[in-house]
């Protein structure tokens, strides 16, 4: 053993080993700093380290065999040792070099591998640079398609469009602050200019933690190439973030949604309407207008899958909310789902549309959940998939699972105020008032002027403590800016305080909006019934009875069109109760509960029995 160390010293192996290790450490340190700055991939740094580790045993062997002299590189003279000892010393040299390299690699490579790229991303609204400002919807469509393509990639975490809508282009945007608010490391921003048959699209990827532009490109092409550009942008961004792209994901990204630009324009307009339909005073009008636009889109391109799926959503929404709970409306939704199934039966959008239809159209919870499980495989970042799971499970009474799914939807869509409100209402049903207020406060943190959320937050005190004062004060503070949107809560507050004048003012504020008395469910009351309730609390019995009789006649027409719709039967029962028709009211109430028992729907059923 001593012979090995003596010979290694004589051949200056120690000196070479020390010099190599110092130089390698310097190279690794410089590469660790330079690779990110030069936007080089992480695997490149790992390759440098591996090559340096492999080179160490080779350097030792070269130092053993050669020496540098004034005459140049010469073979080191062989010492007078037995041949067997020389062989042993060479084996020990190689073993030592390999052991040191392996040990260094054990500590270095995991640390480099642990430096993974944060693959979270948000696609901000694109700026419309077209001379025709009406083309703004086209810029929306560009952003939405790029976002949709990225959301197909399971290796990315993509924030939903609803949460980025507030960061409109054309105003100063602090990208670092936006990244912190959305919980992402990267954002995509860009602009679109459409002129005749040409389109210019600029897109750039920014690391918001450092404000570094990782990639940028301007595309100046024919309008017919717009979908190829969208696919190219999504694929390039995935490459920049080193996202793993499966063959199925790649195929889905490269598949153009339609070949008809006009059909795409119609679809984009309709999708924008659907995106903001619920939770507003124009839900019915928006859904019906969207359905009309989508019918035009599929007439132009009968192979437009996404348009059929969105069309099914619009019809299912009109049916489920109770605007038109008729077999004819459900048949239109079913027809759109079947068209999507014929076109692409295995597409994630098809499974999502079918799940929505099974849930909203038939209350087939198990069937809908099965479809959503399949949809998850190709739509891993789609918040609607997990959001629907949450809504379905709360109707099944699987409350904790429901809240977990809804919280997951909020992670993917953190600024979706409707999802936050619905999750808060789930806590309300469970009387978890602290959690309810916390979620509503979270919504107000990014939408401090949202009247509905402000009133909902104040409503918790009425619901939990029968204290109308916070709600009353809040309503007083925001009138008349957003009267139609808060009219339901205003009406409830006025009736709770037995204030007939305030109740009449609230009723006037409804305009054409639906009256739900603040219910989270689809129990729609007609205006005449409310007039009867107000007349009763103001002791005007003649007026109350006249209003209830007229309300009953109106409600009977609804029942004739949809005889097995529980919420409509529930309202008829309440009208008969107002008329003092006790037996009829009980019969209609029982019928409503038979049609929609609590066992079938623990969320909506509780509203009707409560």
Indicate residue ranges for each PLM-predicted region:
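Acidic, proline/glycine-rich low-complexity intrinsically disordered segments
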Residues: 6, 34-38, 88-493, 497-535, ...
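An N-terminal, helix-rich hydrophobic module
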Residues: 1-107, 183, 212
